[in-house]
């Protein structure tokens, strides 16, 4: 009985992720983009936190990733030339639409998150090679990316 009570207590006291104060200026666009794309609440907010931590140096492009990713959604202009990654509102809506496209392609949000982080081609190749155990063959960074975001949202 103690174990069951402990499990119940865990779920009763577990707190879901909530956006940090730095996210507040962007929440109207984030919430609208999530709603328009049928996303779980705070999925996009959590993705953007994972990508930029809502740090101004990243959002403004002063700091870029080693892969050339820029802005709040860490968009690589070479792969996504139709969006201005330094336009915050445009990037938020683009990231939501792109993640939803990935979800529709792969069938679930977890795989969509992996594809956002690691790339569609890499996820497709891993699925072909490893079947349903594909995530175990993904880089640790991608495994952590998915669990950090989805674990806080689901």
What annotation goes with each model-predicted range?
Residues 1-17:
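Single-pass alpha-helical membrane anchors
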Residues 15-154:
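Catalytic glycan-binding domains that act on GlcNAc-containing polysaccharides
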């Amino acid at each position: 009985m103690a174990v069951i009570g402990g499990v119940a207590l865990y779920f009763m006291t577990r707190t879901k992720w909530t956006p940090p104060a730095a996210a507040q200026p962007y929440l109207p666009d984030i919430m609208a983009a999530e709603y328009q794309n049928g996303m779980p609440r705070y999925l996009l907010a959590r993705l953007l936190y994972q990508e930029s931590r809502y740090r101004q140096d990243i959002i403004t492009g002063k700091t870029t990733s080693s892969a050339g990713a820029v802005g709040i959604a860490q968009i690589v202009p070479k792969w996504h030339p139709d969006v201005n990654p330094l336009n915050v509102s445009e990037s938020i809506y683009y990231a939501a639409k792109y993640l939803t496209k990935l979800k529709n392609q792969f069938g679930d949000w977890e795989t969509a998150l992996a594809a956002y982080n690691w790339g569609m081609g890499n996820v497709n190749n891993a699925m072909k090679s490893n079947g349903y155990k594909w995530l175990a063959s993904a880089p640790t960074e991608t495994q952590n990316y998915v669990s950090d975001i989805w674990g806080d949202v689901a």
